[in-house]
């Protein structure tokens, strides 16, 4: 995962998975969330957080034993609705003017298709990775709770 210090008390790592995988080079991939949860139904009250990082699976296709599937997970056949609900839940648990950092790799699905799933407009973003396929996108929840047009 991308946390500098996963033991930092200000960080809460949530994932639907709780598993361990042996990779082909002998390394172990541990997915051990602080809270095992589904991003479509986040088990926290409205306004609980000032900052949320939303890093959902971005793959629709991956081999059953591939390390990409093990590391990043895979989207369901209902991925548009899943991500729509995920965005909604992230904004629900954010406080007023809370920040949402969204990470997406568009190797299989374009970021424009994903951004169409939320009424909230991003403030800014950054492309990274070897082919600039990974997008880091920043949103801020509006104070009045209104949704952008």
Model region roles, listed by residue range:
Residues 1-149:
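Class I S-adenosyl-L-methionine-dependent methyltransferase catalytic core
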């Amino acid at each position: 995962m991308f946390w500098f210090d996963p033991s930092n008390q200000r960080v809460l790592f949530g994932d639907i998975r709780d598993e361990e995988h042996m990779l082909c080079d002998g390394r172990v991939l541990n997915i051990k969330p602080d809270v095992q949860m589904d991003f479509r139904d986040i088990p926290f009250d409205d306004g609980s957080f000032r900052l949320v990082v939303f890093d959902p699976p971005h793959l629709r296709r991956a081999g059953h034993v591939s390390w990409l599937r093990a590391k990043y997970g895979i989207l369901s056949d209902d991925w548009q609705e899943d991500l729509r609900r995920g965005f909604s839940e992230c904004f629900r648990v954010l406080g007023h003017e809370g920040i949402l950092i969204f990470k997406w790799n568009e190797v299989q699905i374009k970021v424009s298709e994903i951004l169409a799933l939320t009424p909230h407009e991003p403030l800014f973003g950054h492309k990274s990775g070897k082919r600039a396929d990974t997008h880091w996108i920043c949103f801020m929840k509006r104070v009045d709770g209104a949704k952008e047009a």
